[in-house]
Amino acid sequence: MTTNVSIPQYRTDIYSTQSILDPYPHYATLRTLGPVVWLPHQQVFAISRYADCKAVLLDDETFVSGDGVALNPVANRLGRGTTLNSDGDEHATKRSVLAHRLTPKAVRKMTSAVQEKAEGIVDAALSKQSVDGVDDLATALPMSIVPDLVGWPEDGREDLLRWAGATFDSLGPVNRHSVAAVKGAAEMLAFSRRVVRERSVIPGSMGDDVLKAADENKIAKSSCPALMIDYLGPSLDTTIGAISGALDLFARHPQQWQAIRQNPDLIPNAVNEVVRYESPIRAFSRRAVRDVEIDGSRVPKGARVLVIYASANRDEREWDNPDAFDITRDAARQLGFGSGVHGCAGQGLARLETQTMLRVLARRVERFVPAGTPKRAVNN
């Protein structure tokens, strides 16, 4: 593809292992270079500034998801049939199948159950000499809630974390991480097809709603396996990322943890700040269906753009001192859960789980003392 000569290029691979582990210097360079930057390694236009990212996310008629939101064709093919990879009426219809499960009112009804789960998980963790924040807390809570909510059968849960991580990892460009992840993503889809074929979902669950919608011809039966995964994978990974990020940040900023302990009303905004500072979802792509200008830079019809949420959330044009973690800042407009019609459908539950975990910990844990150097996951 030929690029507009006026658009700058950034030749560093932002999906190398080192870049994945420390992406923010690269994002800062992209924002400095311009509103649109060509990435020759990925053959995409990077959108890295807050205002431009939000504008692209809100313009779902120009920047479509139906051709896939990944940076490689295999993942885009595997993602067919999901709400993530659909547009317009198709997207609205598929999202409506579970809409009643995801309203603020529906999520509020889960508060007591989530609270009870969190209390038990913290009890178990604090009985140990040392706690693995990721396994014992961040993973334990969503794993105790989401599979039952979705209706995933018990015999398929031992692989869920590996599959969910692989589903996200497969969304990157063709590199060793996405190539290794495709197997896990394909396994998850194959298992979901079996669940649909055998109708082995838990009665009264989200998965049950999906199958009933197909029975009533509201959606195609062929889309059911992908829709089962649609909520399951992201609901696990985003919440695990948010809680893990919170634990790490509060270990490094003990004064802010003390502020939360003294005033738990700060917790909802603290969760927004955690998601702003360490976005669980770093980026998704879109396809431009017409020639379009982004802040004076021309993106041609047919081009793929990479909307970098994590960069938008550190944009100095939008945030004062963006590289500082500050739970008192108004971070409600962060883009860590996306925006527009494709905003994360499960963000209400992710917020509830993360807030509840922090509330329980704030009552019972004076401080977090790292037992060693945190090992960061490498995920596209």
Describe the role of every protein-language-model region.
Residues 1-380:
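Cytochrome P450
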